[in-house]
């Protein structure tokens, strides 16, 4: 009799652990979908190199629901400029990060995006998540590098990587998501030789 009770308790405990594990596994896939730098190029304009890029971010119902529940997402675009060396590792000349945020505003029923480092604290709002992610994935004429930072007669490489991660949380979301790790993802590096 005691053996049956212990076996039953062990079975219940195993079922509970499996349910928790399945829940964690399903949450880890929350940022599933395409995350890539689709295209990018640099255009020199009066001694300033401007970046043009298109990034595809994942979109799914889990992201939409989390934003509507008060989660903020951070979108980072890492840019690395390195001097190519023939017989040694490339030398990093400059590193920059374009930081953007996305949140859902419940009163207006709109998605609000902003550039974190913008001096004007500009915000733009969008009716749908798809529109907001398309805008966040569009970088047009972002000045990131000055000509004097580059030496003449040297070859340089520009590399981009897009990332999505969990931002600020409401108190309710902090309690629910404190143990999840599925809210951070980065794309592969997208690289090309800099033409001057």
Predicted region positions:
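Structured domain cores in non-transmembrane regions
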Residues: 64-129
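Short, solvent-exposed beta-strand/turn "edge" segments of beta-rich domains on protein surfaces
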Residues: 40-50, 61-71, 87-91, 148-151
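Bacterial N-terminal signal peptides
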Residues: 10-21
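Glycine-rich, aromatic-bearing surface loops/beta-hairpins
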Residues: 144-196
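N-terminal secretory signal peptides that target proteins for export/translocation
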Residues: 1-6
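A beta-strand/beta-hairpin structural motif
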Residues: 50-55, 106, 117-119, 127-150
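Cleaved targeting-peptide boundary
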Residues: 25-36
